[in-house]
Amino acid sequence: MRSLDYAKVITKLVSFIQEKVEESNVKGVILGISGGVDSATVAYLAARAIGKEKVLGLVMPYHINRDVEDALLVCNNLGINYKVINIKSIVNEFEKNLDFELNNVSRGNIMSRTRMILLYAHANSKNYLVLGTSNRSEFLTGYFTKWGDSASDYAPLINLYKTEVWNIARILGVPNEIINKKPSAGLWEGQTDEKDLGITYKLLDEILYRLVDLKMKKENIARELNIPLNKVEYVESLIKKSEHKRKLPIGPEI
Amino acid sequence: MRSLDYAKVITKLVSFIQEKVEESNVKGVILGISGGVDSATVAYLAARAIGKEKVLGLVMPYHINRDVEDALLVCNNLGINYKVINIKSIVNEFEKNLDFELNNVSRGNIMSRTRMILLYAHANSKNYLVLGTSNRSEFLTGYFTKWGDSASDYAPLINLYKTEVWNIARILGVPNEIINKKPSAGLWEGQTDEKDLGITYKLLDEILYRLVDLKMKKENIARELNIPLNKVEYVESLIKKSEHKRKLPIGPEI
Protein backbone atom coordinates (compact mmCIF):
# COMPACT_ATOMS: atom_id res chain seq x y z
CA MET A 1 0.00 0.00 0.00
CA ARG A 2 1.04 3.63 -0.29
CA SER A 3 2.75 5.02 2.76
CA LEU A 4 0.85 7.96 4.19
CA ASP A 5 1.85 10.62 6.67
CA TYR A 6 -1.25 10.09 8.78
CA ALA A 7 -0.78 13.25 10.82
CA LYS A 8 -0.86 15.26 7.60
CA VAL A 9 -3.83 13.27 6.26
CA ILE A 10 -5.81 13.95 9.45
CA THR A 11 -4.99 17.66 9.22
CA LYS A 12 -6.21 17.64 5.62
CA LEU A 13 -9.45 15.86 6.54
CA VAL A 14 -10.12 18.25 9.41
CA SER A 15 -9.51 21.37 7.32
CA PHE A 16 -11.64 19.92 4.50
CA ILE A 17 -14.61 19.69 6.88
CA GLN A 18 -13.96 23.18 8.24
CA GLU A 19 -13.76 24.65 4.72
CA LYS A 20 -16.97 22.99 3.49
CA VAL A 21 -18.92 24.06 6.58
CA GLU A 22 -17.75 27.62 6.09
CA GLU A 23 -18.25 27.65 2.29
CA SER A 24 -21.75 26.23 2.60
CA ASN A 25 -22.66 28.73 5.32
CA VAL A 26 -24.20 26.02 7.50
CA LYS A 27 -24.44 25.70 11.27
CA GLY A 28 -22.99 22.21 11.61
CA VAL A 29 -22.86 18.68 10.23
CA ILE A 30 -24.94 15.56 10.65
CA LEU A 31 -23.98 11.95 9.99
CA GLY A 32 -25.33 8.49 10.50
CA ILE A 33 -23.45 6.63 13.22
CA SER A 34 -23.69 2.90 12.64
CA GLY A 35 -21.31 1.60 15.29
CA GLY A 36 -18.73 0.86 12.61
CA VAL A 37 -15.27 2.29 12.13
CA ASP A 38 -16.00 4.53 9.14
CA SER A 39 -18.80 6.55 10.76
CA ALA A 40 -16.87 6.65 14.04
CA THR A 41 -13.85 8.06 12.22
CA VAL A 42 -15.92 10.76 10.49
CA ALA A 43 -17.54 11.67 13.83
CA TYR A 44 -14.13 12.05 15.50
CA LEU A 45 -12.86 14.14 12.58
CA ALA A 46 -15.97 16.36 12.59
CA ALA A 47 -15.84 16.97 16.34
CA ARG A 48 -12.19 17.89 16.02
CA ALA A 49 -12.91 20.12 13.00
CA ILE A 50 -15.88 22.19 14.19
CA GLY A 51 -16.45 21.27 17.81
CA LYS A 52 -18.73 18.64 19.33
CA GLU A 53 -21.65 21.10 19.74
CA LYS A 54 -21.97 21.39 15.96
CA VAL A 55 -22.01 17.67 15.25
CA LEU A 56 -25.30 15.70 15.33
CA GLY A 57 -25.17 11.92 15.18
CA LEU A 58 -28.19 9.88 14.05
CA VAL A 59 -28.17 6.31 15.31
CA MET A 60 -30.69 4.56 13.05
CA PRO A 61 -30.90 0.83 13.87
CA TYR A 62 -33.18 -1.66 12.15
CA HIS A 63 -31.83 -4.60 14.13
CA ILE A 64 -31.18 -4.07 17.83
CA ASN A 65 -27.69 -5.48 18.39
CA ARG A 66 -24.24 -4.55 19.60
CA ASP A 67 -23.80 -1.98 16.86
CA VAL A 68 -26.21 0.34 18.68
CA GLU A 69 -24.09 0.19 21.86
CA ASP A 70 -20.97 0.90 19.82
CA ALA A 71 -22.68 3.83 18.13
CA LEU A 72 -23.71 5.29 21.49
CA LEU A 73 -20.15 4.70 22.76
CA VAL A 74 -18.86 6.94 19.96
CA CYS A 75 -21.45 9.66 20.64
CA ASN A 76 -20.84 9.64 24.40
CA ASN A 77 -17.05 9.49 24.09
CA LEU A 78 -17.14 12.54 21.85
CA GLY A 79 -19.91 14.31 23.75
CA ILE A 80 -21.78 15.09 20.54
CA ASN A 81 -25.54 15.49 20.31
CA TYR A 82 -27.29 12.41 19.01
CA LYS A 83 -30.71 10.88 18.40
CA VAL A 84 -31.72 7.24 18.16
CA ILE A 85 -34.39 6.53 15.54
CA ASN A 86 -35.37 2.92 14.99
CA ILE A 87 -36.17 2.71 11.29
CA LYS A 88 -38.09 -0.57 11.42
CA SER A 89 -41.55 1.05 11.40
CA ILE A 90 -40.61 3.12 8.33
CA VAL A 91 -39.13 0.16 6.44
CA ASN A 92 -42.22 -1.88 7.38
CA GLU A 93 -44.45 0.87 5.95
CA PHE A 94 -42.55 0.60 2.66
CA GLU A 95 -42.98 -3.19 2.70
CA LYS A 96 -46.73 -2.87 3.36
CA ASN A 97 -46.99 -0.85 0.14
CA LEU A 98 -45.21 -3.45 -2.01
CA ASP A 99 -47.01 -6.43 -3.50
CA PHE A 100 -43.93 -8.63 -3.61
CA GLU A 101 -41.47 -10.13 -1.12
CA LEU A 102 -38.24 -8.26 -0.46
CA ASN A 103 -34.98 -10.19 -0.34
CA ASN A 104 -32.22 -9.19 2.09
CA VAL A 105 -30.45 -6.97 -0.44
CA SER A 106 -33.61 -5.05 -1.42
CA ARG A 107 -34.60 -4.59 2.21
CA GLY A 108 -31.04 -3.47 2.95
CA ASN A 109 -31.30 -0.90 0.15
CA ILE A 110 -34.55 0.45 1.62
CA MET A 111 -32.89 0.72 5.04
CA SER A 112 -29.93 2.60 3.61
CA ARG A 113 -32.11 5.01 1.62
CA THR A 114 -34.46 5.51 4.59
CA ARG A 115 -31.45 6.61 6.66
CA MET A 116 -30.48 9.05 3.90
CA ILE A 117 -33.99 10.57 4.04
CA LEU A 118 -33.82 10.97 7.83
CA LEU A 119 -30.37 12.56 7.64
CA TYR A 120 -31.53 15.08 5.04
CA ALA A 121 -34.78 15.87 6.89
CA HIS A 122 -32.68 16.84 9.93
CA ALA A 123 -30.10 18.64 7.78
CA ASN A 124 -32.88 20.69 6.09
CA SER A 125 -34.43 21.68 9.39
CA LYS A 126 -31.13 22.57 11.15
CA ASN A 127 -29.24 24.00 8.16
CA TYR A 128 -26.58 21.31 8.53
CA LEU A 129 -24.44 19.50 5.93
CA VAL A 130 -24.76 15.72 5.61
CA LEU A 131 -21.34 14.07 5.92
CA GLY A 132 -21.02 10.70 4.18
CA THR A 133 -18.96 7.86 5.62
CA SER A 134 -18.05 5.99 2.41
CA ASN A 135 -14.43 4.94 1.86
CA ARG A 136 -12.50 4.28 -1.35
CA SER A 137 -12.63 0.48 -1.07
CA GLU A 138 -16.46 0.53 -1.02
CA PHE A 139 -16.64 3.22 -3.69
CA LEU A 140 -14.41 1.42 -6.19
CA THR A 141 -16.09 -1.99 -5.73
CA GLY A 142 -19.65 -0.63 -5.62
CA TYR A 143 -20.15 -2.01 -2.11
CA PHE A 144 -22.79 0.60 -1.21
CA THR A 145 -26.41 1.41 -1.88
CA LYS A 146 -26.87 3.76 -4.85
CA TRP A 147 -28.61 6.94 -3.57
CA GLY A 148 -28.40 5.49 -0.06
CA ASP A 149 -25.27 5.45 2.12
CA SER A 150 -23.31 6.94 -0.79
CA ALA A 151 -25.67 9.95 -0.96
CA SER A 152 -24.35 12.85 1.12
CA ASP A 153 -23.11 16.39 0.71
CA TYR A 154 -19.44 15.65 1.36
CA ALA A 155 -17.60 12.35 1.96
CA PRO A 156 -14.32 13.03 3.81
CA LEU A 157 -13.06 9.41 3.58
CA ILE A 158 -13.94 8.80 -0.07
CA ASN A 159 -10.28 8.80 -1.20
CA LEU A 160 -9.02 6.60 1.67
CA TYR A 161 -8.90 2.82 1.59
CA LYS A 162 -10.57 0.88 4.42
CA THR A 163 -7.21 -0.28 5.81
CA GLU A 164 -6.11 3.38 5.90
CA VAL A 165 -9.30 4.36 7.73
CA TRP A 166 -8.45 1.77 10.39
CA ASN A 167 -5.07 3.46 10.89
CA ILE A 168 -6.65 6.90 11.12
CA ALA A 169 -9.25 5.63 13.58
CA ARG A 170 -6.51 4.35 15.86
CA ILE A 171 -4.68 7.67 15.83
CA LEU A 172 -7.91 9.60 16.52
CA GLY A 173 -8.70 7.39 19.52
CA VAL A 174 -11.71 5.51 18.19
CA PRO A 175 -12.39 2.73 20.74
CA ASN A 176 -10.59 -0.53 19.93
CA GLU A 177 -13.74 -2.62 20.16
CA ILE A 178 -15.05 -0.67 17.16
CA ILE A 179 -11.80 -0.83 15.21
CA ASN A 180 -11.27 -4.52 15.80
CA LYS A 181 -14.75 -5.85 15.09
CA LYS A 182 -15.63 -7.46 11.76
CA PRO A 183 -16.83 -4.69 9.40
CA SER A 184 -20.54 -5.00 8.57
CA ALA A 185 -23.12 -2.80 6.86
CA GLY A 186 -25.57 -4.34 9.34
CA LEU A 187 -28.23 -4.82 6.66
CA TRP A 188 -29.06 -8.31 7.93
CA GLU A 189 -28.08 -10.35 10.96
CA GLY A 190 -24.65 -11.93 10.66
CA GLN A 191 -23.73 -9.93 7.57
CA THR A 192 -20.06 -9.01 7.17
CA ASP A 193 -18.52 -6.95 4.39
CA GLU A 194 -15.70 -9.40 3.75
CA LYS A 195 -18.15 -12.33 3.39
CA ASP A 196 -20.20 -10.27 0.94
CA LEU A 197 -17.17 -9.07 -0.98
CA GLY A 198 -15.56 -12.52 -0.97
CA ILE A 199 -12.18 -11.06 -0.04
CA THR A 200 -10.51 -9.45 2.97
CA TYR A 201 -10.17 -5.68 2.96
CA LYS A 202 -6.44 -6.09 3.47
CA LEU A 203 -5.99 -8.01 0.20
CA LEU A 204 -8.70 -6.00 -1.58
CA ASP A 205 -6.92 -2.72 -0.86
CA GLU A 206 -3.56 -4.06 -2.01
CA ILE A 207 -5.13 -5.09 -5.32
CA LEU A 208 -7.24 -1.92 -5.75
CA TYR A 209 -4.25 0.35 -5.07
CA ARG A 210 -2.13 -1.39 -7.71
CA LEU A 211 -4.94 -1.84 -10.23
CA VAL A 212 -6.54 1.64 -10.04
CA ASP A 213 -3.91 4.01 -8.66
CA LEU A 214 -0.71 2.48 -10.01
CA LYS A 215 -2.45 1.06 -13.11
CA MET A 216 -0.29 -2.07 -12.91
CA LYS A 217 -0.93 -5.04 -15.18
CA LYS A 218 -3.03 -7.79 -13.57
CA GLU A 219 -0.31 -10.39 -14.11
CA ASN A 220 2.27 -8.22 -12.33
CA ILE A 221 -0.10 -7.60 -9.43
CA ALA A 222 -0.73 -11.33 -9.02
CA ARG A 223 3.01 -12.01 -9.11
CA GLU A 224 3.88 -9.17 -6.73
CA LEU A 225 1.22 -10.18 -4.19
CA ASN A 226 1.81 -13.86 -4.78
CA ILE A 227 -1.89 -14.55 -5.38
CA PRO A 228 -3.79 -16.31 -8.18
CA LEU A 229 -4.58 -14.13 -11.23
CA ASN A 230 -8.28 -14.82 -10.81
CA LYS A 231 -8.28 -12.91 -7.50
CA VAL A 232 -7.14 -9.78 -9.37
CA GLU A 233 -9.62 -10.46 -12.17
CA TYR A 234 -12.39 -10.81 -9.59
CA VAL A 235 -11.61 -7.37 -8.12
CA GLU A 236 -11.47 -5.93 -11.62
CA SER A 237 -14.94 -7.35 -12.30
CA LEU A 238 -16.29 -5.71 -9.13
CA ILE A 239 -15.00 -2.35 -10.38
CA LYS A 240 -16.46 -2.79 -13.89
CA LYS A 241 -19.87 -4.01 -12.72
CA SER A 242 -20.29 -1.06 -10.36
CA GLU A 243 -19.25 1.68 -12.77
CA HIS A 244 -22.83 2.98 -13.12
CA LYS A 245 -22.97 3.46 -9.35
CA ARG A 246 -20.18 6.06 -9.50
CA LYS A 247 -21.98 8.34 -11.97
CA LEU A 248 -24.92 10.71 -12.03
CA PRO A 249 -27.64 9.61 -14.51
CA ILE A 250 -26.88 10.52 -18.11
CA GLY A 251 -29.01 11.03 -21.19
CA PRO A 252 -28.14 11.21 -24.89
CA GLU A 253 -26.22 14.27 -26.12
CA ILE A 254 -28.51 16.53 -28.15
CA MET B 1 -33.47 28.82 -28.65
CA ARG B 2 -31.51 26.28 -30.70
CA SER B 3 -33.45 24.81 -33.58
CA LEU B 4 -33.75 21.05 -33.28
CA ASP B 5 -34.74 18.41 -35.79
CA TYR B 6 -37.24 16.85 -33.44
CA ALA B 7 -37.70 13.70 -35.52
CA LYS B 8 -33.96 13.06 -35.17
CA VAL B 9 -34.00 13.91 -31.47
CA ILE B 10 -36.83 11.44 -30.85
CA THR B 11 -34.96 8.74 -32.75
CA LYS B 12 -31.89 9.44 -30.61
CA LEU B 13 -33.90 9.25 -27.38
CA VAL B 14 -35.56 5.99 -28.41
CA SER B 15 -32.28 4.33 -29.40
CA PHE B 16 -30.65 5.57 -26.18
CA ILE B 17 -33.28 3.74 -24.13
CA GLN B 18 -32.93 0.61 -26.29
CA GLU B 19 -29.14 0.64 -25.93
CA LYS B 20 -29.14 1.07 -22.15
CA VAL B 21 -31.73 -1.68 -21.65
CA GLU B 22 -29.63 -4.00 -23.75
CA GLU B 23 -26.27 -2.97 -22.21
CA SER B 24 -27.60 -3.38 -18.69
CA ASN B 25 -29.12 -6.76 -19.48
CA VAL B 26 -32.42 -5.85 -17.82
CA LYS B 27 -35.97 -6.94 -18.60
CA GLY B 28 -37.56 -3.51 -18.83
CA VAL B 29 -37.79 -0.01 -17.38
CA ILE B 30 -39.74 1.60 -14.58
CA LEU B 31 -40.54 5.27 -14.03
CA GLY B 32 -42.65 7.45 -11.81
CA ILE B 33 -45.62 8.91 -13.67
CA SER B 34 -46.69 12.14 -12.02
CA GLY B 35 -49.30 13.36 -14.48
CA GLY B 36 -46.88 15.97 -15.76
CA VAL B 37 -45.39 16.39 -19.22
CA ASP B 38 -41.85 15.17 -18.45
CA SER B 39 -42.82 11.76 -17.09
CA ALA B 40 -45.49 11.40 -19.80
CA THR B 41 -42.85 12.08 -22.46
CA VAL B 42 -40.43 9.51 -21.01
CA ALA B 43 -43.27 6.96 -20.82
CA TYR B 44 -44.16 7.53 -24.49
CA LEU B 45 -40.49 7.26 -25.49
CA ALA B 46 -39.98 4.07 -23.44
CA ALA B 47 -43.08 2.37 -24.85
CA ARG B 48 -41.90 3.23 -28.35
CA ALA B 49 -38.35 2.06 -27.57
CA ILE B 50 -38.94 -1.34 -25.94
CA GLY B 51 -42.66 -2.02 -26.18
CA LYS B 52 -45.42 -1.26 -23.69
CA GLU B 53 -45.15 -4.69 -22.01
CA LYS B 54 -41.67 -3.84 -20.73
CA VAL B 55 -42.60 -0.47 -19.23
CA LEU B 56 -43.94 -0.22 -15.66
CA GLY B 57 -45.37 3.06 -14.46
CA LEU B 58 -45.61 3.88 -10.75
CA VAL B 59 -48.22 6.48 -9.93
CA MET B 60 -47.28 7.64 -6.43
CA PRO B 61 -49.60 10.42 -5.21
CA TYR B 62 -49.43 12.13 -1.85
CA HIS B 63 -52.26 14.52 -2.63
CA ILE B 64 -55.29 13.12 -4.45
CA ASN B 65 -55.90 15.60 -7.26
CA ARG B 66 -56.16 15.88 -11.04
CA ASP B 67 -52.54 14.80 -11.49
CA VAL B 68 -53.51 11.22 -10.62
CA GLU B 69 -56.15 11.19 -13.39
CA ASP B 70 -53.62 12.59 -15.85
CA ALA B 71 -51.09 9.95 -14.81
CA LEU B 72 -53.63 7.18 -15.36
CA LEU B 73 -54.55 8.75 -18.70
CA VAL B 74 -50.92 8.34 -19.81
CA CYS B 75 -50.74 4.73 -18.60
CA ASN B 76 -54.05 3.76 -20.22
CA ASN B 77 -53.32 5.60 -23.48
CA LEU B 78 -50.03 3.71 -23.77
CA GLY B 79 -51.36 0.43 -22.44
CA ILE B 80 -48.39 0.04 -20.11
CA ASN B 81 -48.51 -1.81 -16.79
CA TYR B 82 -48.89 0.48 -13.82
CA LYS B 83 -49.41 0.52 -10.06
CA VAL B 84 -50.86 3.25 -7.88
CA ILE B 85 -49.17 3.59 -4.48
CA ASN B 86 -50.32 6.41 -2.24
CA ILE B 87 -47.20 7.49 -0.38
CA LYS B 88 -48.96 9.39 2.40
CA SER B 89 -48.71 6.59 4.99
CA ILE B 90 -44.96 6.25 4.33
CA VAL B 91 -44.31 9.99 4.53
CA ASN B 92 -46.42 10.10 7.71
CA GLU B 93 -44.28 7.33 9.21
CA PHE B 94 -41.18 9.45 8.53
CA GLU B 95 -42.87 12.45 10.18
CA LYS B 96 -43.83 10.38 13.25
CA ASN B 97 -40.12 9.65 13.74
CA LEU B 98 -39.05 13.30 13.62
CA ASP B 99 -39.20 15.55 16.67
CA PHE B 100 -39.62 18.74 14.68
CA GLU B 101 -42.16 20.21 12.26
CA LEU B 102 -41.55 19.77 8.54
CA ASN B 103 -42.03 22.72 6.23
CA ASN B 104 -43.43 22.24 2.72
CA VAL B 105 -40.00 21.96 1.12
CA SER B 106 -38.73 19.33 3.58
CA ARG B 107 -41.92 17.31 3.27
CA GLY B 108 -41.63 17.63 -0.52
CA ASN B 109 -38.08 16.29 -0.34
CA ILE B 110 -39.26 13.30 1.70
CA MET B 111 -42.01 12.63 -0.87
CA SER B 112 -39.54 12.77 -3.74
CA ARG B 113 -37.03 10.48 -2.02
CA THR B 114 -39.78 8.08 -0.92
CA ARG B 115 -40.79 7.74 -4.59
CA MET B 116 -37.14 6.99 -5.49
CA ILE B 117 -37.10 4.19 -2.88
CA LEU B 118 -40.31 2.66 -4.26
CA LEU B 119 -39.02 2.82 -7.83
CA TYR B 120 -35.77 1.09 -6.90
CA ALA B 121 -37.53 -1.56 -4.77
CA HIS B 122 -39.58 -2.51 -7.86
CA ALA B 123 -36.55 -2.23 -10.16
CA ASN B 124 -34.54 -4.56 -7.86
CA SER B 125 -37.28 -7.15 -7.76
CA LYS B 126 -38.08 -7.08 -11.52
CA ASN B 127 -34.52 -6.50 -12.82
CA TYR B 128 -35.63 -3.23 -14.43
CA LEU B 129 -33.79 0.06 -14.99
CA VAL B 130 -35.13 3.21 -13.34
CA LEU B 131 -35.66 5.95 -15.93
CA GLY B 132 -35.45 9.49 -14.59
CA THR B 133 -37.68 12.28 -15.90
CA SER B 134 -35.48 15.31 -15.15
CA ASN B 135 -34.96 17.91 -17.89
CA ARG B 136 -32.10 20.37 -18.50
CA SER B 137 -33.95 23.41 -17.19
CA GLU B 138 -34.48 21.74 -13.78
CA PHE B 139 -30.98 20.27 -13.75
CA LEU B 140 -29.20 23.56 -14.42
CA THR B 141 -31.27 25.58 -11.91
CA GLY B 142 -31.27 22.88 -9.21
CA TYR B 143 -35.06 22.69 -9.30
CA PHE B 144 -35.12 19.08 -8.08
CA THR B 145 -34.65 17.08 -4.89
CA LYS B 146 -31.07 15.90 -4.44
CA TRP B 147 -31.09 12.06 -4.31
CA GLY B 148 -34.83 12.19 -5.01
CA ASP B 149 -36.38 12.83 -8.44
CA SER B 150 -32.89 13.36 -9.86
CA ALA B 151 -31.80 9.89 -8.71
CA SER B 152 -32.27 7.31 -11.45
CA ASP B 153 -30.22 4.97 -13.64
CA TYR B 154 -30.66 6.95 -16.87
CA ALA B 155 -32.34 10.30 -17.57
CA PRO B 156 -33.28 10.49 -21.27
CA LEU B 157 -34.44 14.15 -21.12
CA ILE B 158 -31.52 15.51 -19.07
CA ASN B 159 -30.04 17.42 -22.03
CA LEU B 160 -33.35 18.86 -23.26
CA TYR B 161 -34.87 22.12 -22.07
CA LYS B 162 -38.44 22.13 -20.75
CA THR B 163 -39.71 24.06 -23.78
CA GLU B 164 -38.13 21.40 -26.00
CA VAL B 165 -39.79 18.62 -23.98
CA TRP B 166 -43.14 20.29 -24.66
CA ASN B 167 -42.44 20.12 -28.39
CA ILE B 168 -41.42 16.46 -28.19
CA ALA B 169 -44.49 15.63 -26.13
CA ARG B 170 -46.72 17.11 -28.83
CA ILE B 171 -45.05 15.11 -31.56
CA LEU B 172 -45.30 11.88 -29.53
CA GLY B 173 -49.00 12.40 -28.94
CA VAL B 174 -49.00 13.15 -25.22
CA PRO B 175 -52.54 14.37 -24.41
CA ASN B 176 -52.96 18.15 -24.70
CA GLU B 177 -54.44 18.51 -21.26
CA ILE B 178 -51.11 17.30 -19.86
CA ILE B 179 -48.99 19.45 -22.16
CA ASN B 180 -51.03 22.60 -21.56
CA LYS B 181 -51.39 22.49 -17.79
CA LYS B 182 -49.18 24.58 -15.50
CA PRO B 183 -46.06 22.50 -14.69
CA SER B 184 -45.95 21.49 -11.02
CA ALA B 185 -43.85 19.11 -8.97
CA GLY B 186 -47.06 18.57 -6.97
CA LEU B 187 -45.19 18.73 -3.65
CA TRP B 188 -47.90 20.89 -2.08
CA GLU B 189 -51.36 22.03 -3.16
CA GLY B 190 -51.28 24.92 -5.63
CA GLN B 191 -47.54 24.64 -6.21
CA THR B 192 -46.32 25.56 -9.70
CA ASP B 193 -42.75 25.37 -10.98
CA GLU B 194 -42.84 28.86 -12.49
CA LYS B 195 -44.07 30.42 -9.21
CA ASP B 196 -41.27 28.62 -7.34
CA LEU B 197 -38.66 29.52 -9.93
CA GLY B 198 -39.89 33.11 -10.21
CA ILE B 199 -39.66 33.01 -13.99
CA THR B 200 -41.46 31.35 -16.91
CA TYR B 201 -39.84 28.32 -18.48
CA LYS B 202 -39.97 30.09 -21.82
CA LEU B 203 -37.77 32.96 -20.64
CA LEU B 204 -35.70 30.72 -18.38
CA ASP B 205 -34.73 28.45 -21.28
CA GLU B 206 -33.82 31.40 -23.53
CA ILE B 207 -31.47 32.68 -20.81
CA LEU B 208 -30.05 29.27 -19.85
CA TYR B 209 -29.31 28.39 -23.49
CA ARG B 210 -27.39 31.64 -24.05
CA LEU B 211 -25.69 31.65 -20.65
CA VAL B 212 -24.61 27.98 -20.43
CA ASP B 213 -24.50 26.64 -23.98
CA LEU B 214 -23.51 29.75 -25.96
CA LYS B 215 -21.56 31.23 -23.01
CA MET B 216 -22.77 34.72 -23.96
CA LYS B 217 -22.07 37.72 -21.74
CA LYS B 218 -24.94 38.62 -19.41
CA GLU B 219 -25.19 42.12 -20.81
CA ASN B 220 -25.53 40.79 -24.35
CA ILE B 221 -28.19 38.31 -23.28
CA ALA B 222 -30.19 41.05 -21.59
CA ARG B 223 -29.92 43.24 -24.67
CA GLU B 224 -30.75 40.41 -27.10
CA LEU B 225 -33.80 39.29 -25.12
CA ASN B 226 -34.73 42.85 -24.23
CA ILE B 227 -34.98 42.06 -20.51
CA PRO B 228 -33.46 43.68 -17.42
CA LEU B 229 -29.91 42.53 -16.58
CA ASN B 230 -31.05 41.41 -13.14
CA LYS B 231 -33.22 38.69 -14.73
CA VAL B 232 -30.09 37.16 -16.26
CA GLU B 233 -28.18 37.60 -13.01
CA TYR B 234 -31.02 35.87 -11.15
CA VAL B 235 -30.80 32.81 -13.43
CA GLU B 236 -27.02 32.83 -13.04
CA SER B 237 -27.48 32.79 -9.25
CA LEU B 238 -29.81 29.76 -9.50
CA ILE B 239 -27.11 27.90 -11.41
CA LYS B 240 -24.33 28.84 -8.95
CA LYS B 241 -26.35 28.03 -5.82
CA SER B 242 -27.27 24.59 -7.11
CA GLU B 243 -23.83 23.50 -8.27
CA HIS B 244 -23.45 21.02 -5.38
CA LYS B 245 -26.65 19.30 -6.52
CA ARG B 246 -25.04 18.33 -9.84
CA LYS B 247 -22.10 16.48 -8.30
CA LEU B 248 -21.43 13.25 -6.43
CA PRO B 249 -20.04 13.86 -2.91
CA ILE B 250 -16.32 14.64 -2.87
CA GLY B 251 -13.61 14.34 -0.24
CA PRO B 252 -10.10 15.79 -0.01
CA GLU B 253 -7.44 14.43 -2.40
CA ILE B 254 -4.95 12.24 -0.50
UniProtKB/Swiss-Prot annotation, chains A, B:
Per the record, its GO cellular-component terms are: cytoplasm
Cross-referenced SUPFAM superfamilies: Adenine nucleotide alpha hydrolases-like (SSF52402)
Give the residues the record marks as binding Mg(2+): 38, 138
The protein's annotated catalytic reaction(s) are:
deamido-NAD(+) + NH4(+) + ATP = AMP + diphosphate + NAD(+) + H(+)
What protein family does this chain belong to? Belongs to the NAD synthetase family.
User: Could you tell me what this protein does?
Assistant: Catalyzes the ATP-dependent amidation of deamido-NAD to form NAD. Uses ammonia as a nitrogen source.
Identification of the protein by name:
NH(3)-dependent NAD(+) synthetase
- Species the sequence originates in: Thermococcus sibiricus (strain DSM 12597 / MM 739)
Which gene does this sequence derive from? nadE
